[in-house]
């Protein structure tokens, strides 16, 4: 019997200067009003809150703010003031001067600077100490992103940070349980350790190492490939059947060849923008779903034990390549997968569990209706001969997919599922997940920037404005295309 397949463990649910010293005249003494204006901010990240670094000169993602202070006409005043910025490692990225609007004998200096919150507070204390009058009028919050995200679980803000997620493996692929078919096979265990080392050494941007599969591994792959290929025409969804021949043509999907992840990743990138990367074993649901947010799918490279080719207690490369990859090449399915991932970023453990369960009963064990017939699109079904037959038989309990109730269904690992969930289409499932995602408690929304391959936190008008600008550009392109089409049709 084929167990439930997913690349996260269901057992772990609970769980932006220069120096101005020589560029300004020595003619002033710092005296008057100091005003702080909120600018933008970006944050580094660690375990919680995606908090910023304490060294602005080495942290391009530290907070940005603007300071306006007035100087009395005395020699050396400005230089003394600016040296305080240098001493406290506050990076000045822009400086301007103007006549004071309050006193004609003074000059106001505007400094756009970049620093961490600690350095900024220390700078203000020095300015107060060296001047007679300093009035500090900051907005209600500076570095609001840092403060608002302080209690939010850490999540990757750029695609390269998936290295951290990928290496936080809960169960390594080389750690086999006593009832695993390969537990007593030392040669197989050493082979699994090799695949773990490959995955743990991999970093974002590198080509995925090519594996020279053994004759035994290729033979095992061949058995699985042959048996499942017989069922696909009558059991798999149309999107799967459309992409499978393309994988044969471009990625070497054959009975006598185990495809390479690098070839598969390049193919997916051209088809749907997805990519794959090797992983050493089970990830937590949070880390696995974070990969989907960046259109990155974590894949194992090892092959199941040859003693039982039609069974594996954990996801192997047969499951990944035959179950997941053909659907990840479909743009609509790829979008559906990414939206589940995006909804998980910064969510509570409880909400991540609900999202992971919805993932389980859709992307792993989902059914859809096509031409009046039930068809499978879940990877756990499409890589399991026995459960694929069972799920489409009269013996299976099939329910309509509704995230609110589906998220409460128990996920079974070593037996067939007690219920399967059907959607009319990927689009319907996606819309239902979008509505469900609105119930997730987060003090912000997120937006994936495909140009920088980063996640932008949308929590104020400034951050939302950037997304609106992109939407305007896209709408202008659509309107231009419609106008040209109307001209061509004479409308």
Curated annotation (Swiss-Prot):
Residues 66-141 form the ACT domain. GO terms for biological process: aromatic amino acid metabolic process; serotonin biosynthetic process. Fe cation binds at residues 319, 324, 364. InterPro entries: ACT-like_dom_sf, ACT_dom, ArAA_hydroxylase, ArAA_hydroxylase_Fe/CU_BS, ArAA_hydroxylase_sf, Aro-AA_hydroxylase_C_sf, Aromatic-AA_hydroxylase_C, Trp_5_mOase. Its EC number is 1.14.16.4. It is an enzyme of class 1 (oxidoreductase). GO terms for molecular function: iron ion binding; tryptophan 5-monooxygenase activity. It comes from the Eukaryota. Pfam families: Biopterin_H (PF00351). Interacts with DNAJC12. This is Tryptophan 5-hydroxylase 2.
